[in-house]
Every structure is written in C-alpha cells, then in structure tokens.
C-alpha cells in the first residue's frame, strides 16, 4: 500500500474503491383484476468493488493497450450476496408474495338469530394458516351482505370476520385456481349475553341409507372450519339425536364414529335459542375405492325437497348415456351397478346420496341439484338460502365440499368430472332452466 501511495503522488498508479446500496425493480399492472393491481418486484442490496484507478498511468495503460481492467467485485446483485433483500409491492404496500391469481371467493354474511344480511361487515384475508400474518386483502360486505374477492392464488387462507355489535370469529378456506369458491353463509352472533347459553340439536344419519345412527364421539372447537385446534368440549352421543348447550358463538362440531368417515360441521349458537344442525356420516366402504365417487347432498329445513341429478355423457358423441334421479334411481349395465341414487329425501335436510360404482374413462359426469319444491319458479332464491352443501368422497376421504352460491335459481350445476384425467371441475352455476 505504501508503494501505491507513492505512485499515486505522481499519478502513476492508484487504488480506487466504491461501496453503497443498490436498488432495482420491475412493475406489472394486472389489468384483469377487478381493481387494477400494480405489482412490483424489488431488490435492495449492498455493493462493493475496488481496483486500479482508471485515471492513472497504469490504469490507462491496462485499459487502452492491454484492454484489461483490474477490478474486484466484492459484493454484487447476485445469489452470493448476504446483504440482499427481495420484496413484493402491490399498490404501494409490501406483501409476502404476489396475490394475483385466478381464484375467487364469494359469500354472504348474515345475523345468526334472524338470518338478516349484514352490510359493512369487514373481512380480512390472510395468506396461510396463521391469522394476523401476511394480510392479503381487506374487504367489506355490500348493502345486501354479499362480498366477493377475486385474483387469489391457490392455497390456504385464514379469514377474520367482524361487524359492529357482533362477535368476531375466524375460519380457513381453500382456494383453487380457475374456480370460484362459495363460502357457506357466515353467521354472526350478537355480543349481548356472552355468559348465557344457546342450544343446538339435530339428527344423526347414515349417508348411504338415510337411517338413524348412534353411539359416536363429538368434539367442539372454537371458530369455523377448525378441524385441528384445541378441543373445548368432548363427549358422546348415545342416541340418534343430540342436543348441546353452549355459550353463544361460532364453533366447529366434529363427529367421529367407528367404520364411518369423520365429518365436521359449522354451528352458530344463539343466546336462548335452539338451532337445528343435522349430521350425516358416510360409511367407510371398501366398494367405494379411490377410483369411484360418492356424492352427498344436505341442506336446511327449506325448501323441503332438493333433488340430486347425475348425468353420464359419452365424450365422443356428447350424448347422454344415463341420468340418475328420483324417477330413475339405478343405472345398470347387465348385472353390474354403474350408478345409484342411494337415498332420496323429500322432507328437508337430506341426506340425498348418489354413488358412481363403476367409472368409465370414455364418459364425462355432471352433477346437478334441482329445487323440486320451487320447480316451476323463474325467480326463486330459496335454494340459495337453504344452506345446501355437496360433499364428494373417494375412498375414505372427503375431497371436495361445495356450498350453494348465493344467487337465484332452481338448478345448481355443481361440478363436472372426467375420470380419464381424474379432473373434477367446479362449475357452481345457478339457473332457472337445465
């Protein structure tokens, strides 16, 4: 260094160094979002470099004659830099990752006592399973209590629901790409009377037969869609009906019975009121393996009669091969059962169960629900308010749960299924004609 200092005095050679903070970024406007989403990917990094000064005799000689630059890059914008940070910005706010996707979430928020829509309720949506971290969106219900959020990436989201005068609670939802997920109606409990109790009651039924079942274990957890959290209460149901008294609030009721697939239902307990929540369990059955499907429809007290319709269509000719429903419950090829309407319920609640016993790769299957009670209406919204739910089982696992959209209609096209590709495509379309 002493020699370089001496050379520097006569401008023969010099050593130069430079350090600082570097920044770069790219911006993308997602114009397909309902409200244009401006995304930016930013990088902030420390840089440092040193070398022979290019303005000295030696520096100029190396550069002009030898075409060589003696320079050392100590820190740069590369993967080896320990002093480097990347972050994503959306509309001026830092978020963990880009939230633009093709998934959508819709639903309705209403009071649990009167089932009246709640306007201005707040919904905070967090990416992942931890509430309070990675806030993605904050939205509010409109004057009809409805909400909608689009452009969500596929994955698990934690949702916090709050409204003035009501108890706050949370739940988790799964968003899939290129599909609209409809939440069941989010019921809210008033803050008054937190020390009182309310009652929930219901019947316990076999999904395959529609007959009563008994002798099962139950667990109660706080909030909705909570299948793994701390258990607040546990016990047994010895009879085919049950009754529980709980403090007002939102809970997840887990039902466990030997040789049956465990089921979870969301319940809302209202002060000094009794609410009905029937429970349906699908039996474990080796004849329903992972190559076949069981579809279970349940709903509330009204309408009295919702009907299941399963269509099997030839993919090459686009023509119907079979249609199972209440007037044609079974479809056989020879002595082989292909599809059956196992249970047809006409007196509220369900279950109404359809099973595909033999899948055919040359066919496409479509499942519909029809509001038979209001079958000739061109304006009914009764099915939308019914709390109807469709669960799809393969083997001993419930793979899909569909909640009825909050839209008018007497036909609900729930999903299509292609057994050749094993692709179940949510449709969730409501209409007044099939």
Regions found by a protein language model. Give the residues of each.
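N-terminal low-complexity, acidic/Ser/Thr/Gly/Pro-rich segments
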Residues: 1-99
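Short Pro-Gly-centered beta-turn/loop motif in secreted/extracellular proteins
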Residues: 30-38, 146-156, 164, 238-252, ...
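Extracellular beta-sheet/turn segments enriched in Thr/Pro/Gly and aliphatic residues
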Residues: 86-100, 173-195, 268-289, 409-417
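A short, amphipathic beta-strand motif
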Residues: 103-111, 184, 198-206, 293-297
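Short, acidic Ser/Thr/Gly-rich low-complexity loop/linker segments typical of extracellular
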Residues: 127-148, 212-216, 222-245
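Short strand-edge motifs at loop-to-beta-strand transitions and within beta-strands
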Residues: 145-147, 169-171, 182, 240-244, ...
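A short, solvent-exposed loop/turn motif at the edges and junctions
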Residues: 160-172, 254-266
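Intrinsic-disorder/low-complexity signal
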Residues: 275, 279-434
